[in-house]
């Protein structure tokens, strides 16, 4: 991978006009977003369906949109999936298609919706890629308008608001069940069929999520089954990597697996426990090919003074209402001084620690296997290329590095 630092000249102007921090301003300038684009990206229409108090309002809005055949933009923050019909599973699978700068789903002619998540409900559910049209229900088994809409509206929303919630899926956009979690055989078949459809479409990326059970159903049989699958996955480490490499191989030209997140059973929280978890948090699956190919990738240069936990959190919120979603443009930071002796993390990645006065600690995990820990020493000044995130467990700012240059 060849990294190219972009030239930015309007950062201060965008900061003042858009009222944003410098990291967001540089991202906005690089992407060429207008103020209208930025507002659409920063203020998506979404409801947290885990909050039952606003669930009825959200349900009514969606029903009204379907009844009037008007367009409605929705970001679904969390939902359970295992009760959905087989056709709804296919529906969720096909919705992994990723457009140039956003997810785009619509029932009419191709429009430029701008950045953000767009789920458009109308009289026919389909996704378009240029001149190609792919129905959300392969085979046309559900052509009736009301039935097709009910796949999302009735099955999904009724499940969200129901009393039988057992599994939750954290959705950055919309994903599908991992094949390793308990699924009926028929759903497994359709899942494979859906992945094949995505391969034919040659979309740029796949988003993939798995399930985690709610705490209060500790004795539920399906949860016990999930725990067994979860433990086997973590202990062997093979299922996660096999699925990641399988998805990554679907389109060798451009496609990269963006993330694969397993829930932590019994906690009600979402944890990245797979061996590739931190690469996934970085915004893309960093494979060996990622380091060795000769593609050129833009990099946004940041100053050390740009960094703060608040700035990074706001930046991640802009990328998606859930902190993930839009592909992250790598950033570069020059002049960081290694604060402590380098160490290896649990997954044998090199970990560098930095400390910035009035800001706090910054962890850096190096995902490029070409680096050796003996190259780095406490007190060295370095330049880093990678992506920004916030560690869910330590709350520290984190740089997921793919290139580290020693400056002295």
Predicted regions located by residue number:
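Mid-to-C-terminal polyanion-binding domains and interfaces
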Residues: 64, 70-71, 185, 189, ...
């Amino acid at each position: 991978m060849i990294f190219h630092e972009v030239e930015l000249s309007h950062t201060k102007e965008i900061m003042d006009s858009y009222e944003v921090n410098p990291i967001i301003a540089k991202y906005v300038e690089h992407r060429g977003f207008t103020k209208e684009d930025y507002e659409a990206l920063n203020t998506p229409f979404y409801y947290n369906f885990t909050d039952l108090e606003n669930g009825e309002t959200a349900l009514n809005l969606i029903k009204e949109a379907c009844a009037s055949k008007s367009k409605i933009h929705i970001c679904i923050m969390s939902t359970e999936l295992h009760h959905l019909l087989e056709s709804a599973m296919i529906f969720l699978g096909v919705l992994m298609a990723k457009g140039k700068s956003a997810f785009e789903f619509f029932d009419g002619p191709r429009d430029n919706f701008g950045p953000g998540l767009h789920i458009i409900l109308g009289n026919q559910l389909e996704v378009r890629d240029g001149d190609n049209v792919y129905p959300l229900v392969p085979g046309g088994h559900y052509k009736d308008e009301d039935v097709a809409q009910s796949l999302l509206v009735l099955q999904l929303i009724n499940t969200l608001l129901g009393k039988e919630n057992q599994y939750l899926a954290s959705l950055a956009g919309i994903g599908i069940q991992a094949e390793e979690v308990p699924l009926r055989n028929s759903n497994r078949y359709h899942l494979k069929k859906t992945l094949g459809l995505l391969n034919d479409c040659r979309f740029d990326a796949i988003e993939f999520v798995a399930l985690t059970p709610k705490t209060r159903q500790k004795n539920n049989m399906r949860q016990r089954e999930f725990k067994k699958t979860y433990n086997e996955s973590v202990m062997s480490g093979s299922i996660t990597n096999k699925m990641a490499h399988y998805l990554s191989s679907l389109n060798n030209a451009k496609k990269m697996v963006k993330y694969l997140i397993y829930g932590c059973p019994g906690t009600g929280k979402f944890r990245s426990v797979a061996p590739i978890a931190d690469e996934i948090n970085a915004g893309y699956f960093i494979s060996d090919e990622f380091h060795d190919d000769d593609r050129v990738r833009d990099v946004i240069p940041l100053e050390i003074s740009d960094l703060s936990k608040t700035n990074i959190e706001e930046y991640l919120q802009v990328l998606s209402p859930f902190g993930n979603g839009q592909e992250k443009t790598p950033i570069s930071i020059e002049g960081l001084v290694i604060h402590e002796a380098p160490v290896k993390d649990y997954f044998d990645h090199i970990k560098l620690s930095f400390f910035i006065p009035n800001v706090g600690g910054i962890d850096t995990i190096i995902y490029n296997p070409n680096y050796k820990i003996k190259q780095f020493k406490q007190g060295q000044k370095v330049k880093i290329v990678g992506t920004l995130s916030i560690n869910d467990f330590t709350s520290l700012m984190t740089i997921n590095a793919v290139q580290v240059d020693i400056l002295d």
